[in-house]
Design a protein with these regions (language model features):
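Extreme N-terminal, non-catalytic leader segments
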Residues: 1-35, 46-47, 88
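NTP-binding/hydrolysis catalytic cores, primarily Walker-type P-loop NTPases
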Residues: 4, 242-295
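Phosphate-binding loop that captures ATP/GTP phosphates
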Residues: 11, 60-102, 224
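G-domain G4 guanine-recognition motif of GTPases
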Residues: 14, 31, 164-165, 189-204, ...
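Hydrophobic positions on the alpha1 helix immediately C-terminal to the Walker A/P-loop
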Residues: 40
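Cytosolic-facing regulatory segments adjacent to core modules
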Residues: 104-151
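Conserved Switch II/interswitch segment of TRAFAC-class P-loop GTPases
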Residues: 142-145, 156-174, 199-202
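Beta-strand-loop-alpha "switch" segments that mediate conformational coupling across diverse proteins
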Residues: 216-247, 255-258
Length: 295
């Protein structure tokens, strides 16, 4: 993956870097497992829905531990079942709390570049015809360290990195940002700190991280805010529900609402698009990445 030649990497950056989605597509990533990425995705989705947005979560988990599970939903199929004719693409979509829609695509989708050209074209056409009117897509990405997962993650208009405290977590998040910037030309990132003890701690970590990334990688890291250490959030996770619904006066609920309010003011992409157009870009990215791997 990291051994692309210059022409191949440039082609992939060109394909995945276009701001063509029109609506907001935000990939939620982390540098390590257990950072709280999935819980952040699920709770942000509910907070956005309560703010009047139509939200779709694309859940890439193939272990049943993604955003669908965090919202109490049980996927019965994934994209591989669609290709096998066991269900339709529309039938994959689950409806969660506050009408948040979840599309559980499964881990097999990350290997879409290895599908036959016929299956790729059919899948792209199916996504184009998908009846899913949304204006915010949150991608709960499986593993940012998995090269096969990258087309889905990189076709977004925004990348949000979830960072818990600790030197190891900071180092791994920095490595993730470095890889995405140097290999794929990503220049802007959003930073959400998780399990933070105080606003002062959050400001210090965010400031140091952003300064280091700007100095050594020449990238911009915008600090979004923080989610506090909150036992009610942990309890909501165990209950497979959102803290926004279960504990409306919890500290973490307040922070998710602030985060959603801030996201509503983010600049909108210049051109219009839809879920189908976004997923077509993902499929094209997977095809090119597989070609690069073989070449």
């Amino acid at each position: 993956m990291d051994k692309f030649n210059c022409d191949q990497a440039a082609g992939l950056r060109s394909l995945l870097g276009l701001g063509q989605a029109g609506f907001q597509v935000i990939t939620v990533m982390s540098g390590q497992q257990g950072a709280g990425k999935t819980a952040a995705t699920a709770n942000l989705a509910v907070a956005l829905a309560r703010g009047g947005r139509d939200v779709l979560i694309i859940d890439q988990s193939h272990k049943g531990q993604g955003a669908a599970a965090a919202l109490g939903l049980t996927p019965r199929h994934d994209v591989m079942d669609v290709l096998a004719g066991r269900c339709t693409l529309d039938a994959l979509i689950l409806t969660g709390p506050d009408n948040v829609q979840v599309l559980p695509i499964g881990g097999g989708f990350s290997r879409l570049g290895r599908l036959s050209e016929r299956d790729q074209e059919w899948l792209a056409k199916s996504f184009t015809q998908l009846q899913c009117g949304v204006d915010v897509v949150l991608v709960d990405m499986e593993e940012a360290t998995d090269p096969d997962a990258l087309p889905l993650g990189l076709a977004a208009s925004e990348i949000m990195v979830v960072l818990p405290p600790g030197n190891t977590a900071i180092t791994q998040a920095y490595t993730l940002v470095k890889r995405l910037s140097q290999n794929f030309g990503k220049r802007q990132f959003r930073l959400l700190l998780n399990r933070i003890e105080s606003p002062e701690q959050a400001q210090a970590v965010a400031h140091n991280f952003a300064q280091t990334a700007e100095r050594y990688l020449s990238v911009s890291v915008d600090y979004l805010g923080y989610i506090p250490l909150d036992e009610r959030l942990n309890r909501a996770n165990r209950l497979r529900t959102s803290v926004v619904d279960a504990f409306p006066v919890a500290q973490s609920t307040s922070q998710f609402r602030k985060l959603a309010d801030g996201l509503l003011r983010w600049p909108q992409p210049a051109s219009l698009g839809n879920v189908g157009g976004f997923m077509q870009r993902v499929i094209e990215g997977g095809r090119l990445m597989e070609s690069c791997r073989r070449g």
